[in-house]
Amino acid sequence: MSISLYFLLLLPLFLIFFKKLSPSKGKLPPGPLGLPIIGNLHQLGKSLHRSFHKLSQNYGPVMFLHFGVVPVVVVSTREAAEEVLKTHDLETCTRPKLTATKLFSYNYKDIGFAQYGDDWREMRKLAMLELFSSKKLKAFRYIREEESEVLVNKLSKSAETRTMVDLRKALFSYTASIVCRLAFGQNFHECDFVDMDKVEDLVLESETNLGSFAFTDFFPAGLGWVIDRISGQHSELHKAFARLSNFFQHVIDDHLKPGQSQDHSDIIGVMLDMINKESKVGSFQVTYDHLKGVMSDVFLAGVNAGAITMIWAMTELARHPRVMKKLQQEIREILGDNKEKITEQDLEKVHYLKLVIEETFRLHPPAPLLLPRETMSDLKIQGYNIPKNTMIEINTYSIGRDPNCWENPNDFNPERFIDSPVEYKGQHYELLPFGAGRRICPGMATGITIVELGLLNVLYFFDWSLPDGMKIEDIDMEEAGAFVVAKKVPLELIPTPHQW
């Protein structure tokens, strides 16, 4: 039976359901008129953040939509975001239950997608203590510095012959190696079961499916279940999850080998010890699903986001030679000539690099839509009534391009942050690459250190040029991705060893 026939047969039921579901009182935010059953889904393209941005130009900073029968509010300005993330942080800090997030979080036993409550708080505390604390950040400094040397050595081989470099692959390998050594105790350069190209494919496939649309989440009465299976979405989602879970099991099994040693204590070892001792975190027993849930968060969020940010930064620098020249001159003047190695002590000296990264976050947030929230009670945002159980999407892409916040918002101009109090740490709602409030990214400090150190190395040791015959206007800026948004076309540049 065709999908269209299912729609026709179930249409009367859905009309009744949709009418009952729609809030009937109070001043709701404005929004485009939806259709029965599908709501506003027909008005959304592949790029969800751009679709939201375009609609918000007509319907305002707080916009009401329906994904099928699920009410959704899209927030597109600093002021509205502050109301959600600060004023109503507690009432909006749980997550909607979605098919993909349930699967990849091992039934919400992670940190990023877990429902708000005591279990989530205890898991977050564990991750902060064992992975993201300031003590751990300092202790793992040697890993980040070692991997930055590996990156420089790889690029040097290409620079000697002026061979074009795919910076996507180079920077992904850098971030993946660091994150997996920090979190998993695994040095991928020495693992016999890890192929970096396959790891990259695994991350991209998992993130694509994590951000995929499941009709089951938004259509009632079993229709979504049927469509997901007819379309193949259900099968594709579960195959991707199985491949990721199999990789995690390899890492866990490697930890369990007799006599296996890591170069430091990692969260996998800590949680395995808790599982073996039947220890509790708060009120619950730690299980392998909790372990894999944390691994999923760290692996998918930590590996790709840093690489994406560095790629966009290098892309904008290639498009703006003035900024590139100014940045490299500052770096080399401050750090001096012929420095053999960059250390994290150098990061505090290079102020303009931080401005470039902030401007990159503004124009190219790795996750343009923060992880969705869900209201746990009725509340008001910008004077509009927001019913309980409404999904909230915060569009940092729109906020970063709001002319009320930013002069000439579409221009790449790091100087806009000179003497500006605005930072990315969750206290300024016009710049939210890591979110804010209770659900702010716990790995923020680690993530930004990885990005700063990687960029500092590639900009200090090498001069960069476009391939022969390519002009600045030829650089493709098209985006790709759902959960995180990367540069679709690889950034290929030619490195040259800097002549002192």
Curated annotation (Swiss-Prot):
Main EC class the enzyme belongs to: oxidoreductase
Location(s), subcellular: Membrane
Cellular component, GO, one term: membrane
Record key words, sorted: Heme, Iron, Membrane, Metal-binding, Monooxygenase, Oxidoreductase, Transmembrane, Transmembrane helix
Short name of one Pfam family: p450
Protein topology in the membrane: Single-pass membrane protein
InterPro entries tied to this protein: Cyt_P450, Cyt_P450_CS, Cyt_P450_E_grp-I, Cyt_P450_sf, Cytochrome_P450_71
GO MF annotation list: heme binding; iron ion binding; monooxygenase activity; oxidoreductase activity, acting on paired donors, with incorporation or reduction of molecular oxygen
Segments passing through the bilayer: 1-21
EC numbers: 1.14.-.-
Residues that, per the record, bind heme: 441
Coarse class of the protein's main subcellular location: membrane
Cofactor(s) in the UniProt record: heme
Family: Belongs to the cytochrome P450 family.
Protein name: Cytochrome P450 71B22
Natural source organism: Arabidopsis thaliana (Mouse-ear cress)
Organism lineage: Eukaryota, Viridiplantae, Streptophyta, Embryophyta, Tracheophyta
